[in-house]
Design a protein with these regions (language model features):
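Pyridoxal 5′-phosphate
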Residues: 1-365
Length: 365
């Protein structure tokens, strides 16, 4: 139940990757249609097909953004204390190199409303803020931030909004055409169940011509290519792109309304059960509009890393401990291949752990 880190690709995705790799090894390398991938992806998560770039993951995508902007002297970058290192470290690098301030605001956990989250982020904006970098859905608690409202405020102040969207594609219905923001970085290897090494970056107009490439190869300065000039990275393994196309087609066949309904149903079952476990406190909002398919919590008197090891040994349950920022929460994810039986079993294990404790993980006294 750690789909928030890595999804389990369906057979059609694995077959697409291996078949492409087999053909490359046997014959002249076949080409993957970039246009097909872009169109399929746009049909799934919205956006202009010409705005998509395919780096290896969210980390690389956000590095493209941070390194490609011409930030003026004295500019400030604003982020939060719920950002993944993959989305935040590029800004740490750029601001340290340029001797620019990187400001951080605290987000409530659990959050009570979208308005509370919006005002928490906006409280850090100053006259010098030039970039706001936040998550669409936080990796820490699964909280959904009000990106559309934040985008409107940023646009009114000529502030660049860079969104870490590692989780939403494949989890919830979304439309990049109406969501807002200047840049949207994601990792389809999570909820979209694409192969590892498939990332995406959506670049809104007019940034397709204004952003500097981080990797320069043939065509990097050909503005007629638009965002596609960022896909010119030299020789690359296109089998992962074949797998990404197969993954998007798989989700088209399922329908994102069905997918979101499934993951929300399982998460609701999980969260409702967690609320009845003694000594357990939730960091994920109770408002259904503020979360979708991840739940984070802590059990009094139980070390989350010990609990993680216990769940793995006892039932082969894979989890994620949020050790970043010293939060110490355990995070569980629910995806389409999980079942109500999976949820019931993990709730049983957690209830027993809360009442009886768990052994220390290996290597600890």
């Amino acid at each position: 139940m750690n789909n928030g880190t890595l999804g389990a690709p369906p057979r059609v995705v694995v077959d697409a990757v291996t078949e492409h790799a087999r053909r490359v090894a046997a014959t002249y390398p076949p080409r993957v249609s970039w246009d097909d991938v872009k169109s399929s992806l746009a049909g799934l998560i919205g956006g202009d097909p010409e705005g998509f770039v395919f780096p290896r993951n969210t980390t690389e995508a956000m590095n493209f953004v941070a390194n490609g902007l011409d930030l003026p002297d004295g500019a400030e970058v604003l982020s939060t204390d719920h950002e993944h290192i993959g989305g935040l470290e590029p800004w740490k690098l750029v601001t340290r190199r340029r001797a620019l301030p990187l400001r951080t605001v605290s987000l409530p956990a659990p959050a009570a409303s979208s308005e509370e989250l919006l005002e928490a982020v906006w409280s850090g904006v100053t006259d010098r803020t030039r970039v706001v970098c936040v998550s669409h859905i936080t990796f820490t608690t699964g909280t959904i931030l009000p990106i559309t409202e934040l985008s409107a405020r940023c646009a009114a102040r000529d502030i660049v909004l860079a969104v870490d969207g590692a989780h939403p594609p494949g989890m919830i219905q979304m439309d990049l055409n109406t969501l807002g923001g200047d840049f949207y970085a994601s990792s389809p290897h999570k909820w979209l169940l694409a192969p590892q090494g498939t990332g995406l970056l959506y670049i809104a107009e007019p940034w397709r011509e204004k952003l500097w490439p981080t990797l320069a190869s043939g065509g990097w300065d050909d503005m007629t290519l638009g965002a596609h000039r960022f896909n010119h990275m030299g020789t690359m393994d296109e089998s992962r792109i074949a797998g990404l196309l197969a993954a998007t087609e798989f989700f088209h066949a399922l329908g994102m309304q069905r997918v979101e309904g499934r993951v929300r149903y399982l998460r609701g079952m999980l969260q409702d059960g967690l609320m009845h476990i003694p000594g357990l406190s939730l960091a994920t909002p109770s408002d259904n509009a503020l979360n979708a398919a991840m739940v984070s919590f802590r059990i009094d008197g139980v070390e989350s890393l010990d609990l993680q090891a216990h769940l793995s040994r006892a039932a082969k349950v894979r989890t994620r401990v949020i050790g970043e920022y010293d939060y110490g929460w355990m995070r569980l994810s629910t995806h389409i291949y999980n079942s109500p039986g999976d949820v019931a079993r993990v709730l049983e294990l957690l209830d027993d752990a809360a009442r009886n404790g768990v052994p220390a993980r290996d290597g600890r006294p």
